[in-house]
Amino acid sequence: MSMSFSFQVEATQGAARAGRMITPHGEVETPVFMPVGTVATVKGIPQDLLEELGVQILLNNTYHLYLRPGVEQIRKLGGTHKFMSWDRSILTDSGGFQVFSLSELRKVTEEGVSFRSHLDGSSHLFSPESAMASQIGIGADIIMAFDECTEYPAERTRTERSMELTLRWAERSKNAFEAHKHEVPWFAERGKKSQALFGIVQGGMFPNLRKESAERTVEIGFPGYALGGFSVGEPREKTAELVANTVPLLPENKPRYLMGVGYPEEIVQYARMGIDMMDCVLPTRAARHGLLFTSEGRLTIKNQRFASDEGPLDPNCSCKVCKRYSRAYLRHLYASNEVLAQVLNTTHNLSYYLDTMRRVRQAIILGENSVSLPVVRSPHLSAT
């Protein structure tokens, strides 16, 4: 089998790294922000526009695609790349976080998680083996080990039990993947390349459990490592502290993925800490609620003060929305509940996130003597 996945660090600045991942569907320059395309669509944005925005890799959600249209349907259609007509890289999560979110509808055992569908109430079981089978059938380039996401707050004994379970599931995920990785829908046409399975570090809000989880997950051995179990209601300062302590425990020659985080100023901060990959629904979800990120701060576009504002959304942004439309028009669309409001707002927010990451990467490559990393001030985060 030819090399399916590689990662190389090309430049560093302090703990921050600029790198390059190669997957069966192309190159990804890191640090990278990955838009979330939950059900094989980034809400409101067609694939050609995602390409135009410079999206290199996006997420699909295993839980949602498993329920609808179903893994077998996607597999028969050639995998998710063909299904959604996207020839660049894709990452799927394992479904663990979504099942965790169904707290009323799920039951966790050693075998896996039994749950009821939020669509029709039908019963299902996700186990490490079935999560691997689903992710292999969907056919993303990067897939995730099946894990249990610990709720917040959680007692230490509960968190430790959960961490131990996740480690056992990581072993089972790896074994199941190794046995079936040649079954990915595009295996033959991509020169017998397969997917890359990442391990997930858990351990809740306890630094010593995070350390143990990181060390033991690295011992199992994966081509990349994710930090999971954040964005579950904990204070952002706590997240930052735990990430800063955990990153140095991960191999320097493997990509590090922080799952489900965060605001623009946070993704800058985490890139500074040495995180290579991040995803978050925030730019798309906030856009649908009229919250827009700009170089001048956050704007709530429905505010009356924008009703006569002829200026662009962000004078420092070169996206097609800022080049063409006024704040007054964007406010009108949002107030009128027009679908175009969602499309334009999301286009701008994604552009802002992607551009922020490009600037961070460029700053790392140029080195600290020429450019400092972009500083985005926020009352929530102390400078690092």
Swiss-Prot record:
Keyword Flavoprotein assigned? no
Q: Which NCBIfam families match?
A: Q_tRNA_tgt, tgt_general
Name assigned to this protein: Queuine tRNA-ribosyltransferase
What PANTHER family does the record point to? QUEUINE TRNA-RIBOSYLTRANSFERASE
**Region of interest (RNA binding), ranges:** 260-266, 284-288
Q: Which cofactors does it use?
A: Zn(2+)
Which family does this protein fall into?
Belongs to the queuine tRNA-ribosyltransferase family.
Q: How is the cofactor bound?
A: Binds 1 zinc ion per subunit.
Keyword match Chaperone: no
Residues at which Zn(2+) binds: 317, 319, 322, 348
InterPro entries listed in its UniProt record: ArchSynthase1/Queuine_TRR (IPR050076), TGT (IPR004803), TGT-like_sf (IPR036511), tRNA_ribo_trans-like (IPR002616)
HAMAP family, alphabetized: Q_tRNA_Tgt
Give the quaternary structure.
Answer: Homodimer. Within each dimer, one monomer is responsible for RNA recognition and catalysis, while the other monomer binds to the replacement base PreQ1.
Residues noted as binding substrate in the record, renumbered to the chain:
93-97, 147, 202, 229
